[in-house]
Structures are given as structure tokens and as C-alpha cells.
């Protein structure tokens, strides 16, 4: 059985106040073309369908169009809500959508029930697990000892028992320990929201969402597919793709990536104003790309942003890197420290002293300790 694994569409996202909707439609059209030339049996959407819990109407229409196009191709779709989504809004109409074989995770109320597809090798059970927070799981099992994200996921999966003789796929949206993150994702403070990769061992393939870099975590079948587009300049060097997964007989899983080509790339340029405005340097290049330009001039260039946008119309961000800005960064460091939480300060100190980050258990313990100290002071 062959799947397309997608996640983190972030429909409606704005990067540096530039709307990405046209680029998102372009890349979704490209994905549909890939599906036409690389047939699959189902599509997995591993959360963060939207960029905000209350998405703009244009983003809702875009997702509606994409799901309709998948349904027109008679492809079952298995989708979950992510941390950027409203689980209630994503689940709206899910019973009706299921009649068209668009299966959407419900608002979390207990362990997921399998949805079964069948091929020549037998049944494949698919489990849809929306983004989880500890409070959601404590609401279902109030007597369970749940203090962390890891405890929460462990509790849920302890109540989920896929048949070991059958192939099983889990679609989930969590931060798995050992994975690499980037700045466009919501920050993880001291690893407090990490979950252990070993919790997923009972599944043949785990289609993960949440992190924007395509990667495996430990075993090859525990995988983030990454975003289809670059959503921050920390992703500028990444090569975006979609992930095709083929489950043959039990224990046989083949994974392949197909590259995606964006309408506009997201890149970084660096140089002096004279270098970047020299026709010989920019002619024949993709000047319409989304750009972060760093000027190395020692003096500010008057109206540099407006003047550079004559050549580079999609210039998103402009910075300077010179002796003056380097000195300013040193002076700004104490101010940035004032904006950090006590846990973030301790996590930085721990990293400096031990050359490794806090574990999620340590971070959870520290947070409890900090809260108890603050309560004592308030009392």
C-alpha cells in the first residue's frame, strides 16, 4: 500500500507580512501533479493544515479546494489537527467528510480507533492522533500520573493496541526527542514538550508533523516529511520535498522523497549595496525570490529597502552586518536576557554547564519547582 505523507501546510501563513497563499496554491497544484504521475492509495496530512486557529477565509477555501481535488481522484485522505489548528474547527463536518473518505481526527476524547484499508498483502490499520497536550489527556484519565507531554502520549498509546500481526500506521503531530528543529516552529523550552521515540515502536510507520525539516528520528519509519514550502530564513538551505511511503508485507517499508520546486524560492543574499545593485551581479538571477539581504556597508544607505526593492521586489528583510551592528548586538544581549522566562534562563545555564539540553523530565521538574517558589512568594 502506497501513501503520500504531507504535513504543516500552514495555509494562510504570512512571512514578514508577505502572504504565502499564491505560493501555497502553486505548490499544492504541483503536489496534485505528482500524485497524477506517482499514484498512491491514500494521502496522510499530519497536522498544521492552517497557520492559525482561526484561519482567513482564503485559507479555508484553499484547503477545501485541495481536499476536493484529492477526493475527485478517489484518494482517501487521513488528516489530523496540529498545534496551530483549532481541533474543533478542523473536526467540523468530519462525519460527513468520512462519507467521501476524507477522515479527520476528532477532538481528542480517548485513544484513536483504527480505520482499515486493504491491499494484496492484507489490512492496514490507520490511527489518527491529533496534537496532544497533557491537560487534554488528564481530562480523559484524571487519575493517571500525567506531568509531561511524554507522560500524556505514553498514557494514550498504552490504551491503543494495534494488532502486531497486521500493518499499522500512526499519523501524529508531536515533537519527538532527537529531531532537529528550526526557528519557524514554536519554540521548545528546555525540551518540555518532547516525547520519546520509543513510544511509537508498535507502529510500522509513523507519519509525523510539527517540525519543518524532512528527517527521520532514529528508525527510518519514524519520520517528519517537513513543510512543502520554506517558511523562515532558517530553512533557506533546505530542499523541500514530499514523502512517498510504500508498505508491502509486514516489516517491509520503502520510503522515497520527490523534490518540490516553489514558485519563489526563499534565499539569503549578502554584500555591499554597490555589489547587490550591480547589473552584472543580478541579471539572469531569480530576482523575484523571497529574499533576506544583509548589507555589509559601514554606513546606512538612505532608503535602502525601497531602492533595493526596485531590483528585488520580494525583498522581505534587510539587515546590516558591520562594526556598528556587531557592537550593538553585544550591548543588546542584556536586554534580550530580560525577556526570557526563569525556565529559559536555567535551560541556557544548564546547556552551558553540561553541553547538553535539559531533558523533558528535568524541564518539567524545574517548571514545577519555579511555580511552587512563585506561589510561596505570592503567599
Q: Model regions: which residues?
A:
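N-terminal active-site segment of His-dependent metallophosphoesterases
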Residues: 1-68, 72, 361-372, 376
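Divalent metal-coordination and catalytic microenvironments
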Residues: 8, 28, 43, 48, ...
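Accessory, non-catalytic peripheral segments of nucleic-acid enzymes
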Residues: 37, 42, 247-379
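His/Asp/Glu-rich metal-coordinating catalytic cores
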Residues: 55, 84-216
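A short helix->loop->beta-strand "cap" motif at the edges of active sites that frequently abuts
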Residues: 72-77, 166
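Binuclear metal-dependent phosphoesterase catalytic core
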Residues: 112-124, 129, 222-287
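Acidic, glycine-rich loop-and-beta core segments that form the ion-binding/anion-interacting portion
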Residues: 199-239
Amino acid at each position: 500500500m502506497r501513501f503520500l505523507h504531507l504535513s504543516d501546510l500552514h495555509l494562510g501563513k504570512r512571512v514578514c507580512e508577505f502572504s504565502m497563499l499564491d505560493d501555497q496554491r502553486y505548490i499544492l497544484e504541483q503536489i496534485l501533479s505528482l500524485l497524477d504521475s506517482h499514484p498512491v492509495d491514500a494521502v496522510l496530512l499530519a497536522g498544521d493544515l492552517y497557520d492559525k486557529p482561526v484561519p482567513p477565509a482564503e485559507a479555508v477555501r484553499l484547503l477545501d479546494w485541495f481536499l476536493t481535488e484529492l477526493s475527485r481522484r478517489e484518494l482517501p485522505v487521513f488528516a489530523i489537527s496540529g498545534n496551530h489548528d483549532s481541533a474543533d474547527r478542523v473536526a467540523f463536518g468530519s462525519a460527513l467528510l468520512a462519507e467521501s473518505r476524507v477522515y479527520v481526527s476528532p477532538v481528542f476524547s480517548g485513544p484513536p480507533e483504527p480505520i482499515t484499508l486493504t491491499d494484496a498483502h492484507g489490512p492496514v490499520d490507520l490511527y489518527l492522533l491529533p496534537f496532544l497536550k497533557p491537560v487534554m489527556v488528564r481530562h480523559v484519565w484524571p487519575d493517571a500520573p500525567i506531568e509531561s507531554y511524554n507522560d500524556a502520549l505514553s498514557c494514550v498509546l498504552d490504551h491503543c493496541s494495534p494488532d502486531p500481526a497486521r500493518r499499522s500506521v500512526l499519523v501524529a503531530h508531536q515533537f519527538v526527542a532527537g529531531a532537529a528543529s528550526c526557528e519557524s516552529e514554536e519554540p521548545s523550552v528546555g525540551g518540555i514538550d518532547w516525547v520519546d521515540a520509543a513510544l511509537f515502536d508498535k507502529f510500522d510507520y509513523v507519519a509525523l508533523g510539527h517540525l519543518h525539516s524532512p528527517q527521520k528520528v532514529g528508525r527510518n519509519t519514524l519520520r517528519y516529511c517537513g513543510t512543502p514550502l520554506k517558511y523562515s530564513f532558517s530553512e533557506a538551505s533546505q530542499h523541500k520535498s514530499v514523502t512517498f511511503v510504500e508498505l508491502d508485507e509486514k516489516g517491509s517499508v520503502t520510503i522515497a522523497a520527490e523534490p518540490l520546486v516553489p514558485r519563489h524560492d526563499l534565499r539569503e543574499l549578502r554584500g555591499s549595496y554597490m555589489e547587490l545593485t550591480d547589473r552584472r551581479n543580478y541579471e539572469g538571477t531569480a530576482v523575484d525570490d523571497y529574499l533576506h539581504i544583509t548589507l555589509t556597508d559601514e554606513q546606512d544607505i538612505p532608503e535602502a529597502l525601497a531602492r533595493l526593492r526596485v531590483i528585488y521586489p520580494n525583498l522581505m528583510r534587510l539587515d546590516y552586518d558591520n562594526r556598528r551592528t556587531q557592537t550593538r548586538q553585544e550591548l543588546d544581549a542584556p536586554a534580550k536576557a530580560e525577556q526570557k522566562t526563569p525556565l529559559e534562563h536555567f535551560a541556557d545555564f544548564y546547556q552551558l554547564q553540561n553541553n547538553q539540553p535539559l531533558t523533558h523530565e528535568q524541564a518539567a521538574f524545574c517548571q514545577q519547582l519555579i511555580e511552587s517558589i512563585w506561589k510561596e512568594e505570592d503567599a
